[in-house]
């Protein structure tokens, strides 16, 4: 979805260049991030554990090979976030008036991790989705 949107915005002239795409996965279930870091063209079988970010918990993501290829073609990045990072991100967002569900909180945690990991890119403008009410989760 995001790749298609970025490609269309570029084709229509709304983007002069492609932005850096950052994909976030929970550390407990990160087959794409693992496959990407190991330069695999296909999603590798990885050991996964349950994660509180249920919306991104997929050991065999649909179109995984396509996602890996698109992220490479667009010079994308992957980051993984731990369960405590996700909970802390949701608390931080809630303190600012946005009570989101945990999968969305993983996006914010991913942005924080991205800033730590790619310090030289930390001052860039970012867009990340925050959707889903926090009342959806028992955590």
Task: Please place each PLM-identified region on the residue numbering.
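Short Gly/Thr/Asp-enriched flexible loops that form oxyanion-binding sites at enzyme active sites
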Residues: 1-9
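Active-site/ligand-binding loops adjacent to catalytic centers
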Residues: 8-18, 22-102
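Short, glycine/acidic-enriched capping/hinge loops at junctions between secondary-structure elements
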Residues: 1, 33-34, 138-139
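Gly/Ser/Thr-rich beta-alpha loop segments that engage phosphate groups in nucleotides
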Residues: 2-3, 28, 134-136
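Phosphate- and divalent-cation-binding pockets in alpha/beta enzyme and binding domains
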Residues: 1, 31, 89, 109-110
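Phosphate-binding loop/pocket of nucleotide- and phosphate-handling active sites
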Residues: 16, 44-47, 70, 105-139
